Amino acid sequence: KLYIKTHFCLGESVRVTDWFFIDFVENNGMAWGMSFIGKFWLSLVRSVAIVALIWYLHRIIKQGKHRLVYIFLVALVLAGAIGNMIDSMFYGLMFTASSPYYVAYQVPFGEGYAPFFMGKVVDMFRFPFFTYTWPEWFPIWGGQQGTFFDPVFNFADSCVSVGIIAMLIFCRKELEELGEGKKKSSDKSSSSEKNSSEKSSSGKSSEESARKS
């Protein structure tokens, strides 16, 4: 990321093979350039998610009952999330803004193009494996040409995506146990609330009986 940021103009593209390009783009949003919420709130959500993942990873390592592959995949997702978070936190403070006309360069810390949490994420990999054309009868996209796989992404995006997909495929047991654990804690919480409510109502009944007598 540092090399691309300081050696490529924004939008510059280098062809490696017919199906592999290095394209320098920046985005404010999530993996693969998606964006649904404002930059600040996205960074805040990322921070909370990273803290939660660190806590969870420490917990499952300490428990010592989970498979190594599951621990590795959780760590892989965490590493990817931290990688993109570093861009958001520090790149705006360390570099000038990228432009199609000149290459960004490093500046004294705090004198960059954006404040803390507002930096843009650097993306660079694109794999346009093949093109296709939608059938004319297909709704909305009929007759249009598309490319698989066209989104520009970075290595951190790959860590998050590969980690999550691999967990869904190879770690279903651990994910089911995680879901059952949440359900049990929810049941315990509702049960304790019910018991406290029953105790409160029985206490009130006893007080009323004592007053009547």
Predicted features, each with a name:
Residues 1-213:
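Alpha-helical transmembrane bundles and membrane-interface segments of multipass inner-membrane proteins
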